[in-house]
Design a protein with these regions (language model features):
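A short, conserved, highly charged catalytic patch centered on acidic carboxylates
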Residues: 1-92, 100-186
Length: 186
């Protein structure tokens, strides 16, 4: 009974608990000065609202927006995050409930889900993979140097290419099967 209560508490953990208990310690491990509110800015004001966190360099100039939701309640939050990032000119956005981390490039082409570079589920991935992805996109030095954004853009191009292949391969295969083969006709 105690374990089921614990699981229920995790599921009902409010956004603030996810921010304080998961996000900020993760950012700290990734080298972010989480106590410098000019660099890791909570409740960053944007036109029409506030984003949960803005990761800034130089201070108060956001490079990444992070929106935090309760565990399992991140559906639909991508639209709000995209609007904030797009109107503010922020090149990268992260949506997390602490367990799942979705990394987006709001300025790229396509629907919201098509602009997702990577979706990381901390419970489904190997620890090394999770660490590698978090460092790739969110490590302080990589973000400040622009390497994180370059990596995200390269990963986006790979995802977009794979999506294009998936869309065109069935049509190409069908046209090959429909076309008469001149070698067989002779």
């Amino acid at each position: 009974m105690a374990m089921s209560n614990h699981i229920e508490q995790v599921r009902e953990r409010p956004e603030a608990a996810v921010s304080q208990g998961i996000l900020l310690p993760t950012l700290h491990e990734l080298g972010w000065p989480v106590f410098d509110t000019n660099v890791v800015v909570p409740e960053f004001s944007v036109q029409g609202g506030r984003v949960d966190f803005a990761l800034c360099n130089p201070p108060r100039r956001p490079l990444i927006f992070i929106e935090v939701k309760r565990v399992g309640i991140s559906e639909g939050a991508d639209r709000q995050l995209f609007e904030y990032a797009f109107h503010s000119g922020v090149p990268m956005a992260v949506l997390t409930d602490g367990q799942e981390w979705s990394f987006y490039l709001p300025g790229e082409q396509g629907r919201y889900d098509e602009r997702r570079v990577y979706k990381l589920d901390l419970l489904e991935r190997e620890i090394e993979e999770a660490v590698s992805r978090l460092e790739r996109y969110l490590q302080y030095e990589r973000v400040c140097s622009g390497e994180a954004l370059k990596s995200a853009r390269a990963d986006y191009q790979n995802v977009a290419r794979d999506r294009e292949i998936e869309a065109t391969l069935p049509r190409a295969w069908a046209s090959l099967l429909e076309a008469p083969d001149s070698l067989l006709l002779e």
